[in-house]
Amino acid sequence: MTRTNRTKYRPYLYRAAYVAAGFTTLVVLFGLAYIFPAIAAALPGVQPQGHESPLGNLLLGTEYAVVGLGAAFVLMMSLPGTAADTMRGMLKTFARRFRLLFLRVVRALGWRSYTLRDLGQMVLPVAGLVVVMLLVNHWLAHLPLGPGWVPADEDPRIVVTDNATVPVKFLYNLLHAPVLEEVMSRGPILFVAYLLGTDFAHRSVRPWVRHVVLWAVIAVSVVTFAGLHAFANGSNVASAGFGAVGLTWLALRYRSLLPAILMHGFYNAFVAFA
């Protein structure tokens, strides 16, 4: 490669290096988040999941914040010039870039105005998937499964809100867990789909490569979502895997997290109050 070519492609090489570093960091953070409960359970004052303690809840909840910061770091690296601006301490430029990034992300996640007709079109698929998930759970509960597959006596997430008032329980099951889990699980899928749908991607990336990348992200998301529900038994993992497929279809069908959050929230609320 000649000196001229090196100079010409240097910004792209730097950008690729920043993105690679960001994704590597995110992978490491996801790995740490995966083993964090085991590490936290060995610390003084922390009890295993299923026996709640304030310190345990605080430490075990920190893993989600760490992964969220890692995801934000990766997204920041994806914008041209952001890393360089940050390194040079250009706070004003960084704020402008961050605003652009934020708007791009929320647009990719489906943050837009919805008409009553739009919401009405979501009712049947959302309600249908809730019914399907309840039937899947009923089917799994009656299969002759081994000891490791039987349903747990207590769901740690429900134990947390056992002594709460009905409105608090409803808000927790309808908003807190669904929003957090959908942003972490289906959010990356929608963001990748958004990037692959840009004119730049259509000009630069072959169609089959775009499909492979999207399906790979979907597979990782489904497996991760199912793995995050492995706190109790294999039946819960299988149920979460089925749910992840349906939630992914909803998110991609409407290019929005809203129907997935609604389906996830109403399902959680139904299970909690049934």
Where are these regions (language model features)?
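Short, Lys/Arg-rich, polar N-terminal cytosolic tail immediately upstream
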Residues: 1-11
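Alpha-helical transmembrane segments
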Residues: 14-30, 124-129, 218-223
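Alpha-helical transmembrane segments of multi-pass membrane proteins
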Residues: 24-41, 76-77, 133-138
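Juxtamembrane helix-loop-helix connectors linking adjacent transmembrane helices
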Residues: 40-58, 83-178, 194-208
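Hydrophobic cores of alpha-helical transmembrane segments in multi-pass inner/ER membrane proteins
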Residues: 66-77, 257-259
